[in-house]
Amino acid sequence: MEFSITYDVLVRGGVDVTSVYVPGADEPLSPADGLVVASRGVKLGVDTTLEALTKSGHAGDYDAYIIPGGAGGANTLSKNPTVLHILRDSHANGKIVGMICAGSLAALEARVGLGGPITSHPSVKDKLASCTYAHGLDGSSNLLL
């Protein structure tokens, strides 16, 4: 839901969106049939893979990076060193970095925006106990919460 609704709203708003497949620890570098199965069985197509994006040298070319929630996906993204590197670089370069729901775990792991307000799904709130818990846009750090 966090991915599909965000993707849909951005596309409807005229934003050029690229979805990226990020494999979990024991998953192939790209989905066999080009589809990712979300936690509730919804099949989603992806535009590229993290491996292809990094090899292209264009991983830092985007205006914004959005980390969707969902426990499984948020866990995968927050443990991927390449994703964390992209988040740190993007935030340092003043790009928008957004985390949705449990996606805030990626902010914690990347050490991005922890000096400002942060929000999350209640299931991961305790992991973010050292942060100021809030909702909204923190204009000083380009973090969308």
What is the predicted role of each segment?
Residues M1-D26, S30-D33, R40-V42, V46-L145:
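Active-site-adjacent pocket-lining segments in enzyme domains
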